[in-house]
């Protein structure tokens, strides 16, 4: 695998990590990603909510959690309360419903700030990947493995990848911030 291919793979991973982190940030709409990572105590051991129940959003401001085993509904309700997400689960016999309260302006600003911070972390990560790739290319040149013109071409390709993925991180975060600010 070439240096450029390795770099591209690492940058794609950084972007996927950003998408995953942003999925967990609260918006004004119900989103299963808000609670799927919550740890629930079932059968004597902690498990992620998405591993013990199906999570759906039947309405814009409501989540419906249907446990694979209906006896776990109470444990799921307790686990969501313990997670301190500011959500109040309503437990019935076979499911858990969560009404998503409307976000205040203060919460919107806080969520947008978190979104921006995640984007910046990703861009720093992408630039670190670029630095490591350039160092590897320079090392190969100093060892005589590649020529000067190949080094320059590699550096140019690596910079193009960096620009592309930083722009993609900006676009992803901008879309999420717009989603957060939509009332």
From Swiss-Prot:
SUPFAM superfamilies documented for this protein: Ribosome recycling factor, RRF
A single GO molecular function term of this UniProt record: ribosomal large subunit binding
UniProt keyword list: Cytoplasm, Protein biosynthesis
Disulfide bond positions: none
Pfam families referenced in this protein's UniProt entry, alphabetically: RRF (PF01765)
GO cellular component: cytoplasm
The UniProt record lists the keyword Protein biosynthesis: yes
Main function: Responsible for the release of ribosomes from messenger RNA at the termination of protein biosynthesis. May increase the efficiency of translation by recycling ribosomes from one round of translation to another.
Name assigned to this protein: Ribosome-recycling factor
Species: Protochlamydia amoebophila (strain UWE25)
């Amino acid at each position: 695998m070439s240096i450029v291919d390795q770099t591209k793979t690492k940058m794609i991973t950084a972007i996927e990590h950003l998408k995953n982190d942003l999925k967990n940030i609260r918006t004004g709409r119900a989103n299963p990603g808000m609670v799927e990572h919550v740890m629930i105590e079932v059968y004597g051991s902690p498990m992620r909510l998405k591993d013990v129940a199906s999570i759906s959003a039947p309405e814009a401001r409501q989540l419906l959690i249907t446990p694979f085993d209906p006896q776990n509904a109470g444990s799921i309700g307790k686990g969501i309360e313990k997670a301190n997400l500011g959500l109040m689960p309503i437990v019935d016999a076979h499911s858990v419903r969560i009404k998503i309260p409307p976000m205040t302006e203060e919460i919107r600003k806080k969520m947008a700030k978190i979104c921006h911070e995640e984007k910046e972390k990703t861009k720093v990560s992408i630039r670190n990947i670029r630095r490591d790739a350039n160092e590897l290319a320079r090392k190969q040149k100093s060892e005589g493995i590649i020529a000067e013109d190949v080094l320059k071409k590699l550096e140019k390709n690596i910079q193009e990848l960096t620009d592309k993925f930083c722009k993609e991180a900006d676009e992803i975060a901008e879309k999420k911030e717009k989603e957060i600010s939509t009332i």
